[in-house]
């Protein structure tokens, strides 16, 4: 699943939840306000109709290949400010933009590494990294029908990564400002006296 993350120190979020839930709530609100324009722009990049007729009308020669649905792709582009898993350095996602749907992920990233190797529909095995289409050129033709990938600081893509690139750092700057503001306010509260654990 394609993801754009803003990472921060997990101890800050834990401390806010325990001692200053009002600041935690404000941080989540500010992060959402920073990221919502990127989400809206990314949804706008999903074409109303499939880039090729075969993708919408049938499963592109493979029963498990997801069909194109603009509404599904748009609803699958979401934002969350719930902290994610902590990495070995003590950081977790402070904010995350997801491209959750299978069709959305395909539209977003297809062609990053070129077309999948073709093995044909009669090949054995269950590998997901190969093309089992009856057409050996299906992968290349599929990619040719899609818009070019857009490079961003978070990766290449056609939806969330394109929106992130066109945002030109505004969302990231606003998110970092929100985190810095809450951190300073929390530190000021600590300096003013002992904090009580939230009920």
PLM regions: where:
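Short, Lys/Arg-rich flexible segments
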Residues: 1-94, 99-104, 113-116, 120-199
């Amino acid at each position: 699943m394609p993801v754009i993350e803003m990472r921060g120190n997990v101890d800050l979020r834990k401390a806010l939840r325990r001692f200053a839930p009002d600041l935690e709530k404000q941080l989540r609100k500010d992060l959402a306000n920073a990221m919502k324009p990127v989400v809206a722009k990314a949804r706008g990049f999903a074409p109303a109709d499939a880039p090729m007729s075969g993708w919408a009308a049938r499963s592109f020669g493979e029963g498990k290949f997801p069909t194109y649905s603009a509404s599904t792709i748009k609803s699958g582009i979401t934002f969350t400010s719930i902290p994610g898993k902590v990495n070995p350095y003590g950081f977790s996602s402070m904010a995350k933009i997801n491209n959750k749907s299978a069709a959305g992920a395909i539209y977003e990233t297809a062609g990053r590494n070129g077309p999948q190797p073709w093995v044909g529909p009669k090949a054995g095995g269950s590998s997901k990294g190969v093309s089992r289409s009856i057409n050996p050129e299906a992968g290349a033709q599929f990619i040719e029908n899609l818009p070019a990938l857009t490079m961003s600081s978070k990766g290449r893509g056609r939806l969330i990564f394109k929106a992130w690139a066109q945002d030109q750092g505004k969302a990231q700057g606003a998110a970092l400002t929100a985190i810095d503001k809450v951190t300073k306010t929390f530190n000021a509260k600590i300096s003013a006296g002992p904090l009580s654990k939230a009920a």
